[in-house]
């Protein structure tokens, strides 16, 4: 199945660009920028990429991001991801970035977004991978701070397609950001939110009913609530699931325990994504392979996941259908 997964056309919809910072790149950029790091080399840094839950992961994640200072850094980070994604036959990526992680360190908003966007444009031109950029608000910070960041984003409406919500979930429910999302909708942004990773089904309800999001990031705890399952299916709300991340952060004790297959069986619009691949041990194809092996997924399941990835995207209907046709052509030509 490895070669089949590698060749399968797919989209990635849950990817934090800061989470693609491989130890080697972190060390290189740190040296380039004169940022002292507590690791003598990439191998030591990789060993330090150890954590037991979401919060301990975030602590390491924010420390690593401290090397990102210049437009070139954000360009290099983004281009490295796009090249990796293209090698795994990702045709379209909807990428999260966390400006508050950088502006809180004195990095200009424009520096962050210009570096990322230049790479996205070059990626489309040179690699043929299309993309959309989603700005995430850090939920452990206040709504007022998030609103200030949203104000900064208004100047870049042509670049930023959507608004999301990430970081520490427990104790920071979606309801906390009601006003921010009202403003985002008013300004014409697409909206998504992380919900139901650490938080339970109620957080998903809040994201749907208070924030009125078009897509739920993670959402695995939806299976606790029958009414919620029916609502998600009826309203065709996609769920961007990240299997390796879920196991690494202890949401599930093992991949065999993951509920992805059960979600598929309930006709939920589930997609497979890598989240923060530099930290969780794999990019999108490794996630596909992990669930395929652990949950004994068949080819028809993999096709469904790939089709879902485009159906759940923010591409036009015409573009979605073109990609879905390519999936079926690929599948038909594989014996």
Swiss-Prot record:
Catalyzes the hydrolytic deamination of adenine to hypoxanthine. Plays an important role in the purine salvage pathway and in nitrogen catabolism. The lineage of its organism: Bacteria, Pseudomonadati, Chlorobiota, Chlorobiia, Chlorobiales. Keywords: Hydrolase, Metal-binding, Nucleotide metabolism, Zinc. Its cofactor is Zn(2+). Its EC number is 3.5.4.2. The record marks 218 as: Important for catalytic activity. It catalyses: adenine + H2O + H(+) = hypoxanthine + NH4(+). InterPro entries: A_deaminase_dom, ADE, Ado/ade_deaminase, Metal_Hydrolase. Pfam families: A_deaminase. The active site is at residue 197. GO terms for cellular component: cytosol. Binds 1 zinc ion per subunit. Substrate binds at residue 276. GO terms for biological process: adenine catabolic process; hypoxanthine salvage; nucleotide metabolic process. It is an enzyme of class 3 (hydrolase). This is Adenine deaminase. CDD domains: ADA. Zn(2+) binds at residues 14, 16, 194, 275. Belongs to the metallo-dependent hydrolases superfamily. Adenosine and AMP deaminases family. Adenine deaminase type 2 subfamily. One of its GO terms (molecular function) is adenine deaminase activity. It comes from Chlorobium phaeobacteroides (strain BS1).
């Amino acid at each position: 199945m490895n070669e089949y997964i590698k060749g399968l056309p797919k989209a990635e919809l849950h990817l934090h660009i800061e989470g693609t910072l491989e130890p080697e790149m972190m060390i290189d950029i740190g040296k380039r920028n004169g940022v002292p790091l507590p690791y003598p080399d990439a191998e030591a840094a990789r060993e330090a990429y150890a954590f037991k839950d979401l919060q301990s992961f975030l602590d390491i994640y924010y420390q690593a991001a401290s090397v990102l200072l210049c437009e070139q850094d954000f360009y290099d980070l983004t281009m490295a991801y796009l090249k990796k994604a293209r090698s795994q036959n990702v045709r379209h990526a909807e990428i999260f970035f966390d400006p508050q992680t950088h502006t809180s360190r004195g990095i200009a908003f424009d520096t962050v977004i210009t570096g990322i966007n230049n790479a996205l444009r070059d990626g489309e031109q040179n690699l043929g991978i299309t993309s959309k950029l989603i700005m995430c608000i850090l939920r452990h910070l206040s709504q007022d701070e998030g609103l200030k960041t949203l104000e900064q984003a208004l100047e870049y409406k042509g670049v930023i397609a959507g608004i999301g919500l990430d970081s520490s979930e427990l104790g920071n429910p979606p309801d906390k950001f009601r006003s921010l999302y009202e403003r985002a909708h008013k300004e014409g942004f697409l909206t998504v939110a992380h919900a139901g990773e650490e938080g339970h089904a109620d957080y998903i309800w809040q994201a749907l009913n208070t924030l009125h999001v078009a897509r739920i990031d993670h959402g695995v705890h939806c299976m606790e609530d029958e009414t919620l399952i029916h609502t998600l299916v009826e309203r065709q709300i996609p769920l961007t699931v990240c299997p390796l991340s879920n196991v690494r952060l202890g949401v599930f004790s093992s991949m065999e325990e993951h509920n992805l297959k059960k979600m598929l069986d309930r006709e939920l619009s589930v997609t497979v994504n890598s989240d923060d691949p530099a930290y969780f041990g794999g990019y999108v194809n490794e996630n596909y392979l992990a669930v395929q092996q652990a949950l004994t997924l068949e080819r028809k399941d993999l096709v469904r996941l790939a089709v879902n990835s485009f159906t759940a995207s923010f591409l036009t209907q015409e573009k979605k259908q073109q990609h879905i046709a390519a999936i079926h052509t690929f599948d038909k030509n594989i014996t």
